[in-house]
Amino acid sequence: MLDKADGSIYNEGTANTDEVFAAERRWNGRSSAGQASCLPEKGPVLHGRTAGPEGMGMKQNRPCRLVCVLCALAFALTALPMAAFAQQPEETAAVQQSLTAADVRGMQQADAAVTELTDSEDYTRMSEDERIDAALQQLEELTRQGLVKQGSVYTDAENGMVSFTYSCGALGGILVADPEEENAAALPQLEKEQLQQLAENKRVGTAAIYYAFDNTINSARYPYYAYMQTYWDSVGLQTRLDTTVTVSDLRRMGDYDLCILSTHGAYYTYEYGWLWKRTATEPLILLSEKSDFWSDLRYGFDLLAHRVVKVNGMYAVNGDFFRSAYRGNGIVLSETCEFYGKNGHVDTAMADGLLAGGAKAVMGYVNNVYSVYSRSMLWATVNRMIEGETLEQAVDYAKSIYGTDDIIWYNEQGGRRPHAAASYAMLSGSRSAVLPNPYTAQEAAAAA
């Protein structure tokens, strides 16, 4: 029961024992009000303490005190891991749910320093090891200025990334590896009969190509995507080509029956935890949207929730972003490197996020993929889906032409130095997913 006079808990059955008060004062020389200890096996109790040393369990109380100390120590040790791991990557954002103007100014100052390094001619001429050293030096200076969190810098040489955490808690990175070089190759042309047949197709849905490989200026890649957009639009698939892809654009992917992610990807590893450091690794889709003050404010919640990351001063998104942002029931085809992770660490986070938002099916690649291989696979797959095939049928057809992985294709082109690990397509969701069918049952039966 709570004693309202002094706020302590007492034993109502012995609270009126005057002898107990006297004995207690003789024992420790002071009032015991409000002090607690273990209960003895025998003897009257007041305020959770034995009445005194004379026959009231003083000898028994000493080991009890020791037990209490040990219990408290054990509880503290038990609580430490809980506290150390309490701030998981997702939960860190809960501490702060919006960016202030001061936060954004700090990030912009850090981004300016990072991009000054990564956009320099000296950086382009450096080896990966030299880039890592330069990145670490830059981040050390930013840490000294209070713009980067102390102890947050992590070097992932295997995946060509140096990650860090801004002082506000958002995640950032410096990419030190170059993306796969473009090996220009013309798209295979369809036969005249096929062109005529496809030209007679009715509308088979809508599509969007999210092109962020480059800024399209003097680009070796862009003309192929412009051709695909024009061609698909002419044969029944109403196609939009987005060459200035933003985080906001990706939020509207659910408006289309087919979405194509034509951009670079990366594997991002970062550290978290304040006592015992832990690492987390995830695939990222890299955009060409440069960070600025107002965009940081607009994307502030996603940045703090670690759904959006800034790499080389530009935005990138992960699987949690799609889980939060995608709302649709379309098909998603990705050309990005490591969309499904890599050998030994296949990661379905991207696809899982899209499927959680309602996507019918997702296709992407494990490992770094040759851009010409992924583009050729895309071309063949979409053309077959326009003809009415399922996603699985269309992908199998593309594999029959270009090979089941990109090293097979590379060797058939006469290549002599393939990259380390073959890239291959993976499917998630409904393998029987198709584009909208514009034909009635009678028309389909007549065509058969």
Feature roles, as predicted:
Residues D3, Y10-N11, W27, V45-H47, ...:
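Short, positively charged and aromatic/hydrophobic N-terminal segments
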Residues V69-A79:
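Bacterial N-terminal signal peptides
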Residues A79-E90:
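Sec-dependent signal peptide cleavage junction
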Residues E91-G146:
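Short Lys/Arg-enriched alpha/beta "domain-start" segment
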Residues L99, D103-D119, A185-K290, G300:
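A domain-level signal for caspase-like cysteine endopeptidase catalytic cores
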Residues E141-R203, G341:
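Structured catalytic cores of large enzymes
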Residues Y268-A361:
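Cysteine protease catalytic core and zymogen-processing segment of caspase-like enzymes
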Residues I331-A447:
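Active-site-proximal C-terminal subdomain of hydrolase catalytic domains
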